[in-house]
């Protein structure tokens, strides 16, 4: 059944690691499933969000404003929506279904109740957030290196390899 498959997924999800089977069952009994078609958005930049979503089946892309390529693709067991749920700010990235996707939706009351009642869940959520920060640092470092490389290239004539007008002006 879907509940058995979802329980198995929760067992392998970093967010729910080491939660008791009873806690997982209670969580599932009050959660809802949301099905998305490819291209459908679960979260929209600028809108308010009061849920945390866990990918049960399929995958979603996290797409930042003004950037064509997805920032990250998340699959089974991974979560989205946690930042806007935790800080109450509008959503900072679109979350778009890549495939037919099923999401487990936990509303803010459930999430805050879990945080308050389970140090394990709170710790798991902190680990997920720390992983996201590390990933973003890596992306920023790579982007910064690439920008510096392009700046150097923009100061040299591609044909003659001599410094160009821009180099002289700076």
For the regions a language model picked out, list residue spans one by one.
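Regulatory nucleotide-sensing modules
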Residues: 7, 11-63
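Nucleotide phosphate-binding site architecture
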Residues: 17, 43, 61, 81, ...
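Short aromatic/basic micro-patch
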Residues: 35, 52, 73, 105, ...
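Solvent-exposed strand-loop boundary residues in beta-sheet-rich modules
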Residues: 66-68
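Cyclic-nucleotide recognition modules
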Residues: 70-127, 134
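Conserved nucleotide-binding and Mg2+-coordinating catalytic segments in signaling enzymes
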Residues: 150-170
């Amino acid at each position: 059944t879907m509940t058995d498959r979802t329980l198995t997924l929760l067992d392998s999800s970093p967010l729910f690691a080491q939660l008791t089977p009873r806690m997982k069952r209670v969580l599932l009994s009050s959660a809802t499933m949301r099905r998305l078609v490819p291209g459908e958005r679960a979260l929209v930049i600028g809108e308010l969000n009061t849920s945390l979503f866990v990918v049960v089946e399929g995958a979603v892309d996290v797409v930042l404003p003004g950037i064509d390529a997805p920032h990250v693709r998340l699959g089974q067991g991974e979560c989205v929506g946690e930042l806007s749920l935790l800080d109450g700010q509008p959503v900072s990235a679109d979350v778009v279904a890549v495939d037919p996707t099923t999401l487990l939706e936990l509303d803010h009351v459930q999430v805050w109740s879990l945080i308050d009642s389970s140090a394990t869940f709170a710790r798991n959520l902190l680990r997920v957030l720390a992983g996201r920060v590390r990933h973003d640092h890596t992306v920023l470092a790579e982007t910064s290196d690439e920008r510096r490389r392009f700046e150097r290239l923009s100061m040299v004539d591609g044909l003659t390899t001599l410094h160009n007008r821009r180099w002289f002006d700076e």
